[in-house]
Swiss-Prot record:
Residues 39-109 form the KH type-2 domain. This is Small ribosomal subunit protein uS3c. It comes from Porphyra purpurea. GO terms for molecular function: rRNA binding; structural constituent of ribosome. Signal peptide: none annotated. Belongs to the universal ribosomal protein uS3 family. One of its GO terms (biological process) is translation. The lineage of its organism: Eukaryota, Rhodophyta, Bangiophyceae, Bangiales, Bangiaceae. Keywords: Chloroplast, Plastid, Ribonucleoprotein, Ribosomal protein, RNA-binding, rRNA-binding. Coiled coil: none annotated.
Length: 230
């Protein structure tokens, strides 16, 4: 029986890069790993309506740099950067107070090309009791307008309140999961409805990277917002 590997982990070093970038001794590794989990959980909980696509964490000595990629930077930044300062102070309470924390925000210009945001859109629609086929169709149309070369969406659970759970999926275009050079974005989310939990999976195919192409890094650039706030 075939087994499905995680599309992002399968392509690390080829089309994907690690979301956490740091080195540690075997003694400190588990501590820093738990810190990363706490940082991501806290930010997603505090900014649940900010359309956050990804959070990258870089560590250098006693510095922790948190890079937030969001489609709604205004919610993260707050008025005059107050949101960033509040977030940084909250993270200081969670982590070692001796560590210097920097928070940078990068705006996502096309949210419909991010699997995380597409999956969140579908879960929000399902939780509002929108029919799953309509929610999936709208998500597929939005992804196609974002110039993705292929999209696949699967919804599992008690669809439309059916007594027997099942899975249904839709695919438009190409989604070559076994091609390592294919730039595949993937996300899994859960929708909590009155009938139970529905699982939502989204695959987006953004094209193939040539052998000489480098993994695109999410780093502060001209699109970065408020780089001096730390």
């Amino acid at each position: 029986m075939g087994q499905k590997i995680h599309p992002l982990g399968f392509r690390i070093g080829i089309t994907q890069k690690h979301r956490s970038s740091w080195f540690a001794s075997s003694k400190d590794y588990s501590v820093l790993l738990q810190e990363d989990h706490k940082i991501r959980s806290f930010i997603h909980g505090k900014l649940s309506n900010a359309s956050i696509a990804k959070i990258e964490i870089n560590r250098k000595a006693d510095q922790v740099e948190v890079l937030i990629a969001t489609a709604r930077p205004g919610i993260v930044l707050g008025k005059s950067g107050a949101g960033i300062e509040s977030l940084r102070n909250s993270l200081t309470l969670i982590l070692d107070p001796n560590k210097q924390i920097r928070v940078n925000v990068v705006e996502i210009s096309d949210p419909d090309s991010e699997a995380t945001l597409v999956a969140e859109f579908i879960t929000q629609q399902l939780e509002k009791r929108v029919a799953f086929r309509r929610a999936v169709r709208q998500a597929v149309q939005r992804a196609q307008r974002a110039n993705t070369q292929g999209v696949k969406i699967q919804v599992s659970g008690r669809l439309n309140g059916a007594e027997i759970a099942r899975s249904e999926w839709v695919r438009e275009g190409r989604v070559p999961l076994q091609t390592l050079r294919a730039d595949i974005d993937y996300c899994h989310r859960q929708a909590h409805t009155t009938y139970g939990v529905l699982g939502v999976k989204v695959w987006l195919f953004k094209g193939e990277l040539l052998p000489d192409s480098k993994v695109v890094e999410l780093a502060p650039s001209q699109d970065q917002i408020n780089p001096d706030v730390s």
